[in-house]
Amino acid sequence: VTGARQTGKTSVLRHTFPGHRFVSLDLPSEAELAESAPEDFFARHPAPLIIDEVQYAPALFRHLKVRIDAERGASGQWLLSGSQRFPLMREVGDSLAGRIGLVELDTLSDSEVRASIPGTDALSWIVRGGFPELWAHPDIDAREFQRAYVVSYLERDLRSRLQVTNLRSFERFLRACALRSGQLLNKSDVARDVGVSVPTVTSWLGALETSGMVALLEPWFENGTRALTRSPKLYFRDTGLLLALVNVRDAAALADSPLCGPIFETAVYGTLRRALELRGELDSLVFVRRAQHEVDFVLHRGGRFDLFECKWTEVPDPRDAQTMQRVVELLGVSNVERRFIVCRCRHKTRIDAACEVVPLEALPEVL
């Protein structure tokens, strides 16, 4: 189980598998034992076992491979969790390919929050974010929690992983990325604004992806291929953390912010991402941009397309559907199956015969 810090990985595993023993490699003594003397580690912690923050002992994976191969008939003996996805995946690919199942845990979705706390609306979720701790304890100040989260992330993850010596520069980089959430990523612009090189931006951006803080969405072109050399769009994975980084404290401040549109688009991305991950269809999500015409999100399935445009409004303008029509013509009218405008309306409706209007809360239902 991978995912950003504080998404609930440990809680989910311990709640779901109460009969398993538990050890966290966040403890330096346990991590050192697991890395330098794996056999002694397994003798101290026999299966069935949950191993938390397993990325701190990469040598453990080779020894797990031997044990799994020796007990092929006994599934679920070792449950692993880690908050640094890409290094973890490299170790898994080298040692445990074909021997484990992988799950990535995101922060809570809008629908998960509303199912647990009736009466909560999508705007509250956007502003507060999806970290479980914030919804389990509503008295916690969300912005203080998120600021502490950033400080912890800078100190714990970056110092050890990237050997970043100037944390203030990285914090400026983090805020520069937050100001660009929901927009095309131009690394040269970011490098200029922060005062670092483009290779440094590339390295630091990889760290944000690794830790589950941001995601990149690739463009789609009419020849049916992803243009990997073109600019992707950048999205923060949690809107509450995003709002903390751009100093938007509450719903009223969000409504007055010039960033309300990109922030709402980021929330739509998060909703799409969570729903599509559950279905194993995340690779189907792209965006289309050509000659100044863009549709925020496009789902492609078997040569057919669903289009999603995001609007920070309660009543979409019919001209929004006309803008989508230009992209429909680009993709081929017969290839486009459905068109949606996602906005802050209360109920599903139609803007015309071809285009449906849906609230953020109803978005998973139409996928």
Q: Which role fits each region the language model picked out?
A:
Residues 139-305:
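Accessory nucleic acid-recognition modules appended to NTPase machines
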Residues 20-48:
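Short glycine-rich substrate-engagement loop in P-loop NTPases that contacts/grips substrate
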Residues 12:
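Hydrophobic positions on the alpha1 helix immediately C-terminal to the Walker A/P-loop
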Residues 61-80, 84, 94:
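Conserved catalytic/switch belt of AAA+ P-loop NTPases
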Residues 9:
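Conserved lysine of the Walker
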